[in-house]
Swiss-Prot record:
Its EC number is 3.1.3.16, 3.1.3.48. Residues 33-182 form the Tyrosine-protein phosphatase domain. Substrate binds at H126, C127, V128, M129, G130, R131, S132, R133. One of its GO terms (cellular component) is cytoplasm. The gene is dusp29. This is Dual specificity phosphatase 29. PANTHER family: AGAP008228-PA (PTHR45682), DUAL SPECIFICITY PHOSPHATASE 29 (PTHR45682:SF6). Dual specificity phosphatase able to dephosphorylate phosphotyrosine, phosphoserine and phosphothreonine residues within the same substrate, with a preference for phosphotyrosine as a substrate. Involved in the modulation of AMPK and MAPK1/2 signaling pathways. The active site is at C127 (phosphocysteine intermediate). It is found in: Cytoplasm; Nucleus. It holds the Pfam family DSPc.
Amino acid sequence: MSSAQAEDEQDYETPSCYELQKHFTHGGVAYTHVNEVWPGVYIGNEETARDRYKLQTLGITHILNAAEGEWNSVDTGAEYYKDMQIHYYGVTAEDTPTFNISQYFYSAAEYIQQTLSDPHNKLLLHCVMGRSRSATLFLAFLMLQQRMSLLQAVEQLAHRRHICPNWGFLKQLRELDTHLQEERRRTHT
């Protein structure tokens, strides 16, 4: 790491939720059913998750459903993809500001990282709209596995997909960012 990068990391402050939301509206990406947001990673909505032909066309080998559950969910499950040879991982998360999605940050990031360890794999990360729960988990992946700050992760994703994590999820991502930045500062001093 260069001294300029180290200085930038030391000067970095986690942006407010309001500041982060400004990046969502300035990304300039129109809302679509699915977007490739990282090599081999697609974020999409329920329609994409249920479109077996589209999944085959995209070459999807793995699915992370960030909307399992009984309320505002996508109830596909592993059975839905059984005959397609798609590896399925589901997260029971509600898209409400009070829901603790941070409990899935590390496990989802690990699943994404394991999926991407084979360059032939392609992952669809989805929720109902592909804008809040799935985006939040992918932002956590970028922060945890790619060592991005929250701001870097938001900028990376917002230029590839129209996202809008709810206010509570943004607060949890901010807490993760603060924790990771403190941890990185400790290891560099």
